[in-house]
Amino acid sequence: MKHQRSTTVLGLTLAAALAVAACGSDDEPAADEPADTEASADTEAPAETEAPADTEAPADTEAPADTEAPADTEAPADTEAPADTEPTDGGEAVSLAGLCPDTVGIQLDWMPEAEHGFVYQLVGDGYEIDAGNAYVTGPLVDSNGNETGVDIQIRSGGAAQGFSPVTTLLYQNDPEDVLLGYVYTDEAIQFSGDFPTIAIESGFEKNPQMIMWDPETYPDVTGIADLGTEGVTIRYFGGAAYMDYFTGSGILSSDQVDGSYSGDPSLFIADEGTAAQQGFGSAEPYLYENELEGWLKPVAYEYINDLGWENYAESIATRPENIETYSECFAGLVPLIQQASIDYLEDPAETNEVILDAVDQFGADFGWDYTPGTAEYGIETIKADGLVANGPDDIVGNFDMDRVNGLIELAVPIYEAQGASPMEGVTAEDIVTNEFIDPSIGL
């Protein structure tokens, strides 16, 4: 499932590349045919929320072509795995030297933004930016700023990778170059047959993807189901599995959904809000209210997760064979990622400076404009709407296996109808694991 988002490109409209592939369909193109991806998760959030604008939107994708997929690998059972540590002056620090690659490569699904803050939180002082490739590389540090003995390289996605889906990039690169990537749960289900991945940390408990509408035009609408009752046209990236779920379950009707959305905000503005549209709750509301000339007023929205498509978003995933090969690495690294999620929520200022520095150095080259106001809105919304949160327990970053199995039950028939080939009999244990989660870390 391709999770794409809408953006302003240097002010208002999308660059041609973004208009073609960015923002929100659920179908990822073949490896030969680049596509943009981005993504979702679960937690309770208000049915309607008024807010400013800039968002992302997911989308389904076809399995990448011309890439060799490894044999099916059984996901490890959920267990607790302590990390080796060594004391330093700044406190007890994890040493990843000799356990992880010298540089831990993480492939993102989009350009730098607040939704990626928890991995940028791991970048220490003295980082370097490769503007041509849109990479940020620096020492991988713990919560106290202690270096762990390895570097981290964060690779931007979207236009920087020719809009290739993260799943494709994980198979096109050696693990020593790209060990991890952002893979949404529904995407993992879609590609589980031919290009399997296993997520080792959940990222976002709740998917930021939403449907938004103009509350002035539709004052009686409080959620997506009301849009269905009113017969409002809803634009989305064609092929999105969640939309097939909405139409198949009767929440929306097939004659009111329009799969022509390309990420360009101009249509929403031009039709004066008579149509609804997909987006990211942590972005578009701010963009539309504060930055898009011609609109500059609030939109209302409801998260897709709240209607039963309980997708985890921005999950940190790897190829299945890496679970055993890099088990000691993950045992030390995953708790650092968990803690980084908490640290970023509590004090995002320094990490946002890294994100904005990256945008300043290479954003324009890839048609990406991201402002300090959008970053601040993003982190505020991530906290307020519970997009990053503990699971049903007191642990951050772990997976609810029943929830994942519930999404599998919904998603497999949809993907098969779309022509994808999910793993026969796929279960939660095939695509996610809590093996490396530290149960003592939570919000």
Predicted regions and their residues:
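Pocket-lining segment of extracytoplasmic ligand-binding domains
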Residues: 186-187, 261-364
